[in-house]
Amino acid sequence: MAAAVTVEEVRRAQRAEGPATVLAIGTATPANCVYQADYPDYYFRITKSEHMVELKEKFKRMCDKSQIRKRYMHLTEEILQENPNMCAYMAPSLDARQDIVVVEVPKLGKAAAQKAIKEWGQPRSRITHLVFCTTSGVDMPGADYQLAKMLGLRPNVNRLMMYQQGCFAGGTVLRVAKDLAENNRGARVLAVCSEITAVTFRGPSESHLDSMVGQALFGDGAAAVIVGSDPDEAVERPLFQMVSASQTILPDSEGAIDGHLREVGLTFHLLKDVPGLISKNIERALGDAFTPLGISDWNSIFWVAHPGGPAILDQVEAKVGLDKERMRATRHVLSEYGNMSSACVLFILDEMRKRSAEDGHATTGEGMDWGVLFGFGPGLTVETVVLHSVPITAGAAA
């Protein structure tokens, strides 16, 4: 009788050989585009707050300093007129918000996922795992289930739903997708972040200026990636390899960013020194990730940093002595889309690989080999993903 297979042999056969690789990226936004220059007038009019003249001036200054040119929002004037409680500062409105997001979050995620699947070019039946992340509402079965049904994925696709993580979670999604791809030979993971500000939109208040910071920064968007190890390069085109991924809670940062789901929707609280807390700890995060690789020149790597706001980017740049062009892709996404929470870093990855090809760089990482992706959010939590670019071949810009 043949000897039984050992557990070690089973594990070896289950694991992939190479690192997890980003094989495709897709992004989507609602059709409704909001220009930042016009937003203070619109916001105070739609929330019936035009009598708050001084507060409006403060909000205008927030918008002017945001370095955001435009954002996309599912909430149109018509929707807000139909839901006046969402326009008040603190009126019960969770049901109305939930009714919107449980439909629109999976729908926007589907639009991004379809683009990623089209670029990947393989049958949907090859998708083995689905990771879905949103901070916009909660439902059961979740947005992961809804998306799997909408896309016609196999009923035995392995799903993971992440609710209420916040702005660091684009990094979390990649970390989880990496582990799934590397520990399941042949796995192809569809990872989706979909965020809609219908949960956080509310009128202004003199007593809650940090809520107004959110009103000045947040936008809607969804992004999707296909992740897998050992790509079949006859039919799959790698974009970035994920070399390591880690998460940490910053010291002395409790309460710096909070979100609470209440009858009034998702309330947002922000301490003033979030940029300082992040910049103070950024060198340690970089050192932990790159010292094993013998890298200590932070201008020699490409950067994908969650653009929580311009002050975070400014202080990180100053702390580690970054050249301005290192954050070019990051600042472009902040300018053109605002802070889309978890989806931002995937938008930036997409922008980076496209711009690298258009500008004639040798690699998907602006001509550099190694790069870092940072997620920053409630906790304060920092996600750090070490990336390796791939060479750009002829036609890769298409």
UniProtKB/Swiss-Prot annotation:
Give the highest taxon in the source lineage.
Answer: Eukaryota
Task: Name the enzyme's class.
Answer: transferase
Residues bound to substrate are 200, 219-220
- Write one Pfam family the protein is assigned to: Chal_sti_synt_N
Q: Which InterPro entries match?
A: Chalcone/stilbene_synt_C (IPR012328), Chalcone/stilbene_synt_N (IPR001099), Chalcone/stilbene_synthase_AS (IPR018088), Polyketide_synthase_type-III (IPR011141), Thiolase-like (IPR016039)
Give the EC number: 2.3.1.74
A single GO BP term for this record reads: polyketide biosynthetic process
Asked if Plastid is a keyword of the record, the answer is no
Q: Does the keyword Oxidoreductase apply?
A: no
Q: Name one GO molecular function term.
A: acyltransferase activity, transferring groups other than amino-acyl groups
Q: Which reaction does it catalyse?
A: (E)-4-coumaroyl-CoA + 3 malonyl-CoA + 3 H(+) = 2',4,4',6'-tetrahydroxychalcone + 3 CO2 + 4 CoA
Q: Which UniProt keywords apply?
A: Acyltransferase, Flavonoid biosynthesis, Transferase
Active site as annotated: 167 (acyl-thioester intermediate)
The pathway it acts in is: Secondary metabolite biosynthesis; flavonoid biosynthesis
Annotated residues that bind CoA are located at: 58-65, 311
Task: Report the sequence similarity comment from the record.
Answer: Belongs to the thiolase-like superfamily. Chalcone/stilbene synthases family.
User: How does it associate, per the subunit comment?
Assistant: Homodimer.
Q: What does this protein do?
A: The primary product of this enzyme is 4,2',4',6'-tetrahydroxychalcone (also termed naringenin-chalcone or chalcone) which can under specific conditions spontaneously isomerize into naringenin.
What is this protein identified as?
Chalcone synthase 1
- Please report the organism this UniProt entry assigns to the protein: Oryza sativa subsp. japonica (Rice)
